[in-house]
């Protein structure tokens, strides 16, 4: 009689701990993916500034890569992640 009782208690503890872990994970997912633009902590102007800095940085890296090859920069598109160097070399 003692062995089935201990087994049952152990099983209940195991199931309850797994259930609490699953509930915590599901509530974390809800917190992560909920986004409301009206209560957003991001300032659109600072976000736009970060995008400009990213674009300048990407095109600067593109120009450096072209210079290492001894070529001029031809096109740089941050949106399409496109960097093209000229065909002719630097004279």
From Swiss-Prot:
A cellular-component GO term for this protein: extracellular region
Q: Which residues form the signal peptide?
A: 1-20
Q: Could you tell me which cysteines form disulfide bridges? A: 59-76, 62-83, 66-85
InterPro entries assigned to the protein according to its UniProt record, in alphabetical order: DEFL_AtLURE1-like
Q: In which tissues is it expressed?
A: Expressed in the pistil. Detected in the synergid cells.
According to its UniProt record, where is this protein located? Secreted
**Location, primary (coarse class):** secreted
Q: Kindly state which keywords UniProt assigns to this record, in alphabetical order.
A: Disulfide bond, Secreted, Signal
Give the protein family.
Belongs to the DEFL family.
Record function comment:
Pollen tube attractants guiding pollen tubes to the ovular micropyle.
What is this protein's name? Protein LURE 1.6
As recorded in Swiss-Prot or TrEMBL, the protein's gene is named LURE1.6
């Amino acid at each position: 009689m003692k062995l089935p009782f201990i087994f049952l208690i152990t099983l209940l503890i195991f199931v309850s701990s797994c259930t609490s872990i699953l509930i915590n994970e599901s509530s974390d997912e809800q917190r992560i993916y909920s986004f409301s633009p009206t209560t957003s902590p991001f300032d659109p102007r600072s976000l736009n500034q970060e995008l400009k800095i990213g674009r300048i940085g990407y095109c600067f890296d593109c120009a450096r890569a072209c210079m290492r090859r001894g070529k001029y920069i031809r096109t740089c598109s941050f949106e399409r992640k496109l960097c093209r160097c000229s065909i002719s070399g630097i004279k």
